[in-house]
């Protein structure tokens, strides 16, 4: 069922306005960037004034997942599972060099070269670790993106380039990232 064009634009505006100013955040903090996330949520920077509510009880109550820190291949299935538990529409901010591209550990055998290999990322915040102001800037960019979204039936669908068969490379499955156990050689 399509919303008539006359009603569609005002409804889309209201839905996107509500989404953009009531983001419940689920922080997946893995390293020092998580400390900067906590600093951003404190009273000095106060991202609640932007409509961002920190510390959702879990992924099922969250709209926004902030992945901060080094993502290892062993942690990848947990990130993928938590992302899948989030209700639509869901957004992801990759916060810091480690979650963007592996950071200083990019050449390690066990480090995923960016969280975007696992889940679609909406905003990248660079830095090692990024300052709280950088996260605030990333949230503002995400809110601009939400305001420009088209809403589908029920107002929750959005095009996802990584999920579509024609757009971009598909993210790796979490199962492909689980390495077999490494056993020490047996003495002979």
UniProtKB/Swiss-Prot annotation:
Record's keyword terms, sorted: 4Fe-4S, Cell membrane, Iron, Iron-sulfur, Membrane, Metal-binding, NAD, Quinone, Translocase, Transport
One GO term describing the cellular component: plasma membrane
UniProt-annotated binding residues for [4Fe-4S] cluster: 32-33, 98, 128
BP GO annotations: aerobic respiration; electron transport coupled proton transport
Chief place of localization: membrane
Domain of life of the native organism: Bacteria
Enzyme Commission number: 7.1.1.-
Entry keyword annotation includes Protein transport: no
Ranges for region Disordered: 153-188
UniProt membrane topology term: Peripheral membrane protein
Disulfide bonds, paired cysteine numbers: none
Record's catalysed reaction(s): a quinone + NADH + 5 H(+)(in) = a quinol + NAD(+) + 4 H(+)(out)
InterPro entries attached to this UniProt entry: NADH_UbQ_OxRdtase-like_20kDa, NADH_UQ_OxRdtase_20Kd_su
Cofactor details (free text): Binds 1 [4Fe-4S] cluster.
Class of this enzyme: translocase
Cofactor (UniProt): [4Fe-4S] cluster
Location(s), subcellular: Cell membrane
MF terms in GO: 4 iron, 4 sulfur cluster binding; iron ion binding; NADH dehydrogenase (ubiquinone) activity; NADH:ubiquinone reductase (non-electrogenic) activity; quinone binding
HAMAP family: NDH1_NuoB
UniProt record similarity statement: Belongs to the complex I 20 kDa subunit family.
Function: NDH-1 shuttles electrons from NADH, via FMN and iron-sulfur (Fe-S) centers, to quinones in the respiratory chain. The immediate electron acceptor for the enzyme in this species is believed to be a menaquinone. Couples the redox reaction to proton translocation (for every two electrons transferred, four hydrogen ions are translocated across the cytoplasmic membrane), and thus conserves the redox energy in a proton gradient.
Assembly mode: NDH-1 is composed of 14 different subunits. Subunits NuoB, C, D, E, F, and G constitute the peripheral sector of the complex.
PANTHER family hit by this protein: NADH DEHYDROGENASE (PTHR11995), NADH-QUINONE OXIDOREDUCTASE SUBUNIT B 2 (PTHR11995:SF33)
Protein name in the entry: NADH-quinone oxidoreductase subunit B 1
Species assigned in the record: Salinispora arenicola (strain CNS-205)
Gene: nuoB1
